[in-house]
């Protein structure tokens, strides 16, 4: 994968400016799996090949009409090139079947206008609208957005915001093919997933270097792609592929509160503490509400760092940084042991009627870094030692059947990543 871009800003005068950006992103994924029988005969089980290239053009003009009225209007044009050929065997040692195939290009075009209006010295109103269309299937959306902020004291503010947002799915979803439909892409007419967002915000300036925010929110999703009469929803997608017919009949609901306490960098010290308490539910194709895969219920982060100026003239910098996370455990569905034993490949089967009803214990994750920066007149050298997931916290990847013990066990794995880096700036 890779990305690059260039940006240009032009000032017509003190009140009007135009910003234009050209960018390109590239992603390629190749994967194969081979299955073996008891005689060590092999057969291909999975063959995934897909690449996506996006050319993105964005331009926006910002105009300050007065001290209390500013407007920003812009467009984004994304040219999406795709090439995918994805095959999967229904069972081990069976011939692979085509599940998604497509090659070509399409366009995602969006435009927006947003205005900031100073109603008074304490109250600011932001209103706007966003529109977008996907030419692949002519799906379109018109999304009103508005927010109001009341600075009712020098240290305290209150804000309320509402907006409608829409998104397209990953490109492979639109080109799913099934054995019963032949070359027809069964999901090509899928519409956008849409959502209403409402957020409150209370901000309090504790001091010149410290700020606190409390932000309750509510999100209602609709037109979510799901499998009819099933608990499946794309909101829980974590596989590299989708192989089923989807319909825009699902829903989702997120409600929670975010609390943030932040000390800005001052005298070499900074820190931030965040706490999120939330509930995340989805409504599947079987018309039942359940926990989403991501409903951890809480996440607490503490991060901070300290910088010391050292050296003969105090021009060099030694720094220590850390991040600690405590979050609810991974969600999973109970294993259907009978169905697993009946499966010819002993592939673990789950009780999808109770999808994501189980939860592992909370997770404790730590990261830290130590750095030293040498500053010279025309060049600087920075050395750093970093460690990600220092505590070796294990993530959940599913369950597997152990043929030696005839037992089903969860697959857990920890990715701890220490590294040493050097950066040269001139």
Kindly give the residue locations of the regions a language model identified.
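Surface-exposed extracellular loop regions of Gram-negative outer-membrane beta-barrel proteins
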Residues: 28-30, 83-90, 135, 155-198, ...
